[in-house]
């Protein structure tokens, strides 16, 4: 299991430090990482606080250097075949297609045609429904990431953790089913 903490808002790094401590005790098998990282100093800070992986909305070679030095996987956001290629050249195994809802499944399919070795995660506009998830997996995405559509504010505010768990479980089932029919 992996969980990406979004680096957004004042004192986000302090909240992350507490979440890492909680996860180490309550979910020791879960990899805690950080997302929305755009520069090397931010990557360094979160790595020092315990991030097991770093995700960004864009590709920054300086973030790749920091992560490579500490053997921390870096998944940069890429919006073109060129960006994916450049990210792979500096050691990024998994590249994030972002924003997915703008680029679409055909972008992933087109990318994988000349670069079938590419490992692709799609975020931004992925929704926890069977058709949406299947469209990405069938296009060649290796995995998808979801945020507010998987964790709606109203559900979180109500403390309805069963609904969150159910939606996560359903989404994983949709991924498995899409992979089987691929």
Regions found by a protein language model. Name each.
Residues 1-5, 30-36, 54-55, 74-77, ...:
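Hydrophobic faces of well-ordered beta-strands that scaffold small-molecule active sites
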Residues 5-24, 39-44, 54-88, 97-116, ...:
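Active-site-adjacent beta->alpha loops and helix N-cap segments on the catalytic face
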Residues 51:
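Glycine/small-residue-rich phosphate/adenosyl-binding loop
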Residues 124-130, 149-150:
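Glycine-rich beta-alpha junction loops
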Residues 134-148:
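Short glycine/proline-rich, acidic loop/turn segments that cap or connect secondary-structure elements
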Residues 170-178:
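C-terminal alpha-helix
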Residues 180-182:
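Eukaryotic N-terminal low-complexity, Ser/Thr- and Lys/Arg-rich leader segments
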């Amino acid at each position: 299991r992996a969980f990406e903490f979004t680096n957004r808002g004042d004192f986000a790094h302090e909240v992350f430090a507490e979440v890492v401590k909680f996860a180490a005790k309550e979910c020791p098998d879960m990899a805690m990482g950080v997302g929305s990282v755009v520069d090397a100093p931010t990557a360094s800070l979160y790595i020092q606080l315990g991030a097991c992986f770093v995700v960004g909305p864009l590709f920054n070679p300086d973030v790749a250097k920091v992560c490579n030095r500490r053997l921390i996987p870096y998944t940069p956001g890429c919006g073109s075949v060129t960006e994916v290629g450049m990210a792979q050249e500096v050691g990024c195994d998994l590249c994030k297609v972002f924003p997915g809802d703008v680029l679409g499944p055909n972008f992933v399919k087109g990318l994988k045609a000349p670069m079938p070795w590419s490992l692709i995660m799609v975020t931004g506009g992925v929704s926890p429904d069977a058709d949406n998830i299947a469209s990405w997996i069938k296009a060649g995405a290796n995995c998808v990431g979801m945020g507010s559509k998987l964790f709606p504010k109203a559900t979180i505010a109500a403390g309805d953790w069963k609904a969150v768990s159910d939606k996560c479980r359903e989404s994983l089932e949709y991924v498995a089913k899409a992979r089987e029919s691929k």
